[in-house]
Amino acid sequence: MVNKYVILLFAIIVLFIGGCSSAGSETGMLQGKVTIGPISPVERPGETPTIPCEVYEARKIMVYDERGNKLIQQIDIDCDGRYRAELKPGIYTIDINRIGIDSSTDVPQKVEIKSSTTVRLDIDIDTGIR
């Protein structure tokens, strides 16, 4: 009788450990750099203005299902313009939440996330300020 419980306990532990160890490898990474500009109507050639953190924080990277219909995740952009997120393997449509007249020729774009790999997507946002 004791042997049955020991075997059952051992089987449960093996299943639990096996389930935990494979979970980490079942995701991929999406990361990139966002550039935003211009941020003022007059920018002199050769000058690179400092982008305030609030400009990045107001925008998000939007991850939709493959068709672009269902929002899967919103990704924050840090004060240096970088973003990073773990996603399950699959095909996603990546876009931005547009503020005012923001535009980008880089998105929307489909990306394929594979297990244990990183996809890089850099996005240039034109604020439309002239």
What are these regions (language model features)?
Residues 21-23:
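Bacterial signal peptide processing site
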Residues 99-125:
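Structured interaction patches on ligand/partner-binding surfaces of diverse proteins
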Residues 16-19:
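C-terminal motif of bacterial Sec signal peptides marking the signal peptidase cleavage site
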Residues 32, 77-85, 123:
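Glycine-centered loop-to-beta-strand initiation motif
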Residues 28-36:
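A short, amphipathic beta-strand motif
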Residues 36-68:
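Short, ordered, surface-exposed loop/turn motifs in non-cytosolic proteins
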Residues 66-80:
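Short, acidic Ser/Thr/Gly-rich low-complexity loop/linker segments typical of extracellular
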Residues 90-100:
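A short, solvent-exposed beta-strand micro-motif common in secreted/extracellular proteins
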